[in-house]
From Swiss-Prot:
The gene is ydjG. InterPro entries: AKR (IPR020471), AKR_Detox_Biosynth (IPR050523), NADP_OxRdtase_dom (IPR023210), NADP_OxRdtase_dom_sf (IPR036812). Catalyzes the NADH-dependent reduction of methylglyoxal (2-oxopropanal) in vitro. It is not known if this activity has physiological significance. Cannot use NADPH as a cosubstrate. Seems to play some role in intestinal colonization. Induction: Is 3.5-fold up-regulated in vivo in intestinal environment compared to the level for in vitro cultures. The active site is at Y59 (proton donor). It comes from Escherichia coli (strain K12). Gene3D superfamilies: NADP-dependent oxidoreductase domain (3.20.20.100). Belongs to the aldo/keto reductase family. Aldo/keto reductase 11 subfamily. This is NADH-specific methylglyoxal reductase. Monomer. Disruption phenotype: Deletion of this gene affects intestinal colonization by E.coli, since a deletion mutant reaches a 1.2-log-lower cecal concentration than the wild-type. The record marks K85 as: Lowers pKa of active site Tyr.
């Protein structure tokens, strides 16, 4: 498994990490999954050379962290890079975020809330330190906390040995500059796929200039780029309001994936593997966060690391995706 250094830390990350949002189950994913299969999926990721497991309290109200914690009991702790997040809460107030089922989530990055969250995450995960601690969504009014205050408490947690590295998700360029003003920022998490390339405009160059790893999530657009979505599919749960799952857009994507078949034949790979290989081609700073809910999905995703996509084919795929936006 290819690895990349994490900022100025002594941590190295596999170029592919396991995302566990779906493993957490709950209303966002139309119910819970078989817990043993979820644990087996995490164990398979480790066997395949993936050392990073990403989770968050907001993934079904801590359930994802609990499942990850159960898997961690079966793995050598020093071989796993555990990444979880703070800033999305449900047991204290904050700025309104999403409602999941009948429960309201809030944004809160106050120092008091972060300290509560890190303690709860450590307990759910069953570990005594978190390798990468990431702000999940950035603070907004009315419960606004300046980045300076958030970074201050993260720096304290780092000095206390509770976290090893600091990350930020769902940030813009100004956020990144402000984080760097008050401390180190080792990694960001941003949405990126061949269908959503906005990150290329400013975030990717800024991170390259500052040695910040870019961890991309939703590289398969919540399953749309797996090639398993049929024309009669009706999206529900977390997919229901997504732009690319609107019927007209979804059908365009399905047409594009059919045009990928000659490329899949050339590289002897599947559609999702090709989509992941395209992302890896874009920058050596990129680490893919790829979700899976079954061991075989992990094995398929990892195959993308063995594809040496040519410049010409990467350009062709980009042009196909750009054509969907016209």
């Amino acid at each position: 498994m290819k690895k990349i250094p994490l900022g100025t830390t002594d941590i190295t990350l596999s170029r592919m990490g396991l995302g566990t949002w779906a493993i957490g189950g709950g209303p966002a994913w139309n119910g819970d999954l078989d817990r043993q299969i979820c644990i087996d999926t995490i164990l398979e990721a480790h066997r395949c050379g993936i050392n990073l497991i990403d989770t968050a309290p907001g993934y079904n109200f801590g359930n994802s962290e609990v499942i990850v914690g159960q898997a961690l009991k079966k793995l050598p702790r020093e071989q796993v890079v555990v990444e979880t997040k703070c800033g999305i809460v449900w047991e204290r107030k904050g700025s309104l975020f999403n409602k999941v089922g009948d429960r309201q989530l809030y944004k809160n990055l106050s120092p008091e809330s972060i300290r509560e969250e890190v303690a709860a995450s450590l307990q759910r995960l069953g570990i005594d330190y978190i390798d990468i601690y990431m702000t999940h969504w950035q603070s907004v009014p009315p419960f606004f906390t300046p980045i300076a205050e958030t970074v201050a408490v993260l720096n304290e947690l780092k000095s206390e040995g509770k976290i090893r590295a600091i990350g930020a998700a769902n940030v813009d360029a100004d956020h990144i500059r402000e984080y760097l003003q008050y401390g180190e920022l080792d990694i960001i998490q941003a949405k990126y796929s061949i269908l959503d390339r906005a990150m290329e405009n400013e975030l990717l160059p800024l991170c390259r200039d500052n040695g910040i790893v870019v961890q991309v999530y939703s590289p398969l657009e919540q399953g749309l780029l797996t090639g398993t979505i049929t024309r009669d599919y009706v999206p529900g749960g977390a997919r229901a309001n997504k732009v690319w799952f609107q019927r007209e857009n979804m059908l365009k994507v399905i047409d594009m994936l059919e045009q990928w078949q000659p490329l899949c034949a050339r590289y002897q790979c599947t559609i999702p593997t090709l989509a992941l290989a395209w992302i890896l081609k874009q920058s050596d700073l990129i680490s893919i966060l790829s979700g899976a809910t079954a061991p075989e999905q992990v094995r398929e995703n990892v195959a993308a690391l063995n594809i040496n996509l040519s410049d010409a084919d990467a350009t062709l795929m980009r042009e196909m995706a750009e054509a969907l936006e016209r």
